[in-house]
């Protein structure tokens, strides 16, 4: 598979997010961009009016010998779960998926500034993974050491592993909280009560028109999105799809 076909096989919103999140950190790693302009901090955004920082913090991650493997895992999660959501749950409705990312990004930015978290890539990716896991909660996933469990538990397993191995876990908790907020407001509540609490702005539909068969709004996403349980496993411990359970 050549590079062009690989990229064209990724839905449009995921494609641009994935490309930015791989290229920009590499440019920073090799000194082509000044990383001092990339991170998120309350004082710089609010008091010094550097309003670009929530955006640069979304696509930049400090790649070092110590963080490089973790960055690769985040890029893999982004590719796998963002692609799955956009091409399955939001199939033909990339504008609705973009609105989900904007919703999550807005709240991740606020929480991360409050908690002095300088980069948004990890909590944003975890928020997307959380939504996928809730929509596909009965899918069986395989984790390290042969562990298998329903997808609904995957975000918490990742949180536990990172808390133990890296001494952190705050990034994952922010992602879980934001992902749950979106899932409840945009998917679960409308599915149970038939009332849309939020809806995608029309300008996003004009920017990325729905494909044939796509519908505007969020109502019914869970009913229409749940797939038959499938298997996932983690290559070398971290994730590719299996053909079945």
Swiss-Prot record:
<feature type="compositionally biased region" description="Gly residues">
    <location>
        <begin position="234"/>
        <end position="245"/>
    </location>
</feature>
<dbReference type="GO" id="GO:0005783">
    <property type="term" value="C:endoplasmic reticulum"/>
</dbReference>
<comment type="function">
    <text>Specifically required for the degradation process of misfolded endoplasmic reticulum (ER) luminal proteins. Participates in the transfer of misfolded proteins from the ER to the cytosol, where they are destroyed by the proteasome in a ubiquitin-dependent manner.</text>
</comment>
<keyword id="KW-0472">Membrane</keyword>
<dbReference type="GO" id="GO:0051788">
    <property type="term" value="P:response to misfolded protein"/>
</dbReference>
<keyword id="KW-0653">Protein transport</keyword>
<keyword id="KW-0812">Transmembrane</keyword>
<keyword id="KW-0256">Endoplasmic reticulum</keyword>
<keyword id="KW-1133">Transmembrane helix</keyword>
<dbReference type="GO" id="GO:0036503">
    <property type="term" value="P:ERAD pathway"/>
</dbReference>
<protein>
    <recommendedName>
        <fullName>Derlin-1</fullName>
    </recommendedName>
</protein>
<dbReference type="InterPro" id="IPR035952">
    <property type="entry name" value="Rhomboid-like_sf"/>
</dbReference>
<dbReference type="GO" id="GO:0036498">
    <property type="term" value="P:IRE1-mediated unfolded protein response"/>
</dbReference>
<keyword id="KW-0813">Transport</keyword>
<feature type="topological domain" description="Lumenal">
    <location>
        <begin position="122"/>
        <end position="166"/>
    </location>
</feature>
<dbReference type="GO" id="GO:0006897">
    <property type="term" value="P:endocytosis"/>
</dbReference>
<dbReference type="GO" id="GO:0005768">
    <property type="term" value="C:endosome"/>
</dbReference>
<dbReference type="GO" id="GO:0005047">
    <property type="term" value="F:signal recognition particle binding"/>
</dbReference>
<dbReference type="GO" id="GO:0015031">
    <property type="term" value="P:protein transport"/>
</dbReference>
<dbReference type="GO" id="GO:0005769">
    <property type="term" value="C:early endosome"/>
</dbReference>
<feature type="region of interest" description="Disordered">
    <location>
        <begin position="218"/>
        <end position="245"/>
    </location>
</feature>
<feature type="topological domain" description="Cytoplasmic">
    <location>
        <begin position="1"/>
        <end position="5"/>
    </location>
</feature>
<feature type="transmembrane region" description="Helical; Name=4">
    <location>
        <begin position="167"/>
        <end position="187"/>
    </location>
</feature>
<feature type="transmembrane region" description="Helical; Name=2">
    <location>
        <begin position="58"/>
        <end position="78"/>
    </location>
</feature>
<feature type="topological domain" description="Cytoplasmic">
    <location>
        <begin position="188"/>
        <end position="245"/>
    </location>
</feature>
<dbReference type="GO" id="GO:0005789">
    <property type="term" value="C:endoplasmic reticulum membrane"/>
</dbReference>
<dbReference type="GO" id="GO:0097038">
    <property type="term" value="C:perinuclear endoplasmic reticulum"/>
</dbReference>
<feature type="topological domain" description="Cytoplasmic">
    <location>
        <begin position="79"/>
        <end position="100"/>
    </location>
</feature>
<feature type="topological domain" description="Lumenal">
    <location>
        <begin position="27"/>
        <end position="57"/>
    </location>
</feature>
<dbReference type="InterPro" id="IPR007599">
    <property type="entry name" value="DER1"/>
</dbReference>
<dbReference type="GO" id="GO:0030968">
    <property type="term" value="P:endoplasmic reticulum unfolded protein response"/>
</dbReference>
<keyword id="KW-0346">Stress response</keyword>
<feature type="transmembrane region" description="Helical; Name=3">
    <location>
        <begin position="101"/>
        <end position="121"/>
    </location>
</feature>
<feature type="transmembrane region" description="Helical; Name=1">
    <location>
        <begin position="6"/>
        <end position="26"/>
    </location>
</feature>
<dbReference type="Pfam" id="PF04511">
    <property type="entry name" value="DER1"/>
</dbReference>
<dbReference type="GO" id="GO:0043229">
    <property type="term" value="C:intracellular organelle"/>
</dbReference>
<comment type="similarity">
    <text>Belongs to the derlin family.</text>
</comment>
């Amino acid at each position: 598979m050549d590079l062009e076909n690989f990229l064209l096989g990724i839905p449009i919103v995921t494609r641009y997010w994935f490309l930015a999140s791989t290229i920009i950190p590499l440019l920073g790693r090799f000194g082509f961009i000044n990383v001092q302009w990339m991170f998120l901090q309350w004082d710089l955004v609010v008091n010094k009016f550097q309003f670009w920082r929530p955006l640069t913090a979304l696509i930049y991650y400090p790649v070092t010998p110590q963080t490089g493997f973790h960055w690769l895992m985040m890029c893999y999660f982004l590719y796998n779960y963002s692609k799955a959501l956009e091409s399955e749950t939001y199939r033909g409705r990339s504008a609705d998926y973009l609105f989900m990312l904007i919703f999550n990004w807005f709240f991740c930015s606020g929480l991360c500034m409050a908690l002095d978290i300088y980069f948004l890539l990890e909590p944003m990716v975890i928020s997307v993974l959380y939504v996928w896991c809730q929509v596909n909660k009965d899918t069986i996933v395989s984790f390290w050491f042969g562990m298998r469990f329903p997808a609904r538990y995957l975000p918490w397993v990742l949180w536990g592993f990172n808390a133990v191995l890296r001494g952190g876990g705050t990034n994952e908790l922010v992602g879980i909280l934001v992902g749950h907020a979106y899932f409840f407001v945009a998917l679960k509540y409308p599915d149970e009560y038939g009332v849309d609490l939020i809806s995608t702005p029309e300008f996003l539909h004009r920017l990325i028109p729905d494909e044939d068969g796509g519908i505007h709004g969020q109502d019914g996403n869970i009913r229409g999105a749940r797939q038959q349980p499938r298997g996932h496993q983690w290559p070398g411990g971290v994730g590719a799809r299996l053909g079945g359970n």
